[in-house]
Amino acid sequence: MPDVARRDLNLLPKAHLHLHFTGSLDIPTLRELSAWEGLDEAEQLIDDDPLSVPATKRGWWRFQRTYDIARHVVISERALRAVVDAAARNDAAQGSRRTEIQVDPTSYAPYVNGLVNALEIILDEAALASRRHGIQMGVIVAASRLHHPLDARTLARLSARFAGRGPGGVIGFGLSNDETEGNTVEFGPAFRIARRAGIPGVPHGGEFRGPHHIAQVIDELHPTRIGHGIHAAESPALLKRIVDAGITLEVNPASNVSLGVYPDYSKVPLRTLLDAGAQVALGSDDPLLFLSGLTDQYRIARDYLGLSDAELAELARMSIRGSFAEQADKARWLAEVDAWLAAAPESGPGLPAAGVVPVPGGLVARPSGLLVPERGLVAPPGNGGAESADAGQAVPDARNVTPGL
């Protein structure tokens, strides 16, 4: 790669709007949690095969097992707090001013005496971690498509009790997991409960299914943002509808490629969305499993999709505008983006999205600062092969893989 003058993307002020709870873990924290609980799950996850091969070769069930292994170490109040703190710390180091992490507290309720306790612990730590790391962290409560729609209503009512825009508040209500499961229409009442409490909807849609599914999500759930929504690029009419409605799309390039939605980074249709006028917020989805942090998504946009620093700055502005932060905070962060762009760029070779730097202890530091095990590194797919899907198509058994939220 030729020498170019580039600004440091870790210093670019931004908001992180698509981040799942257990998937936000880094390897050192995962190891620490395993040691606390006297478990060996971390070594299974790190030393065995699941993280050493691309997700497109693992398949859905193997990927589900990988996520479940990580989730099995989050079995105490101490662990819940550690996950939140690590997410805030890692995002702050990557320039995030506002992180909106999503969680299904149902997964952790058995370990802390109930659903209310699980959510209160997470919210309390989100407020503490915000102050500790100089970042705002809001919480999205996400229902699962794999659970009964009545469970989603329970979560919506619980969310209403803790609604609030500031750090430690429930700032959004989501719906995630396997898009092929569940009837979107049946989750509509839960989203109505949330809206009546002033909580905006942020459901997943259009990660593996096409424009028709995204349109159904819009019709039935009335979202303010859509998690993924990447296949909207295939329908100019749908894209216009999204733009006219002011819906922000949470796009996760590394996740899309790792799961076989697109064969390589250059095929992610980010430019199509931007050229149509869509509001886009880049997110990492599950850094633990995709070995790719928030800043890495901006590097992918720069190094593989050719976005300039001015365009990257506008992406950061979109993420801030798409957040549920107070307007005064947004104005301050937007001014910081302007200052980043006005500063003189650094000279030297730009780091590719997959660049890594060896560090002691058998770990490597990605450009974003995320520490991952050396043997767990996954190079960006893109060399084709039987395991790669055609653009816009999912591999047969690669489905939405965020069960733990």
What are these regions (language model features)?
Residues 1-199, 208-213, 220-225, 231-377, ...:
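Metal-cofactor-binding active-site regions of metalloenzymes
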Residues 379, 386-389:
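Short linear motifs in low-complexity or flexible loops
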Residues 382-385, 399:
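Intrinsically disordered, low-complexity Ser/Thr/Pro-rich tracts
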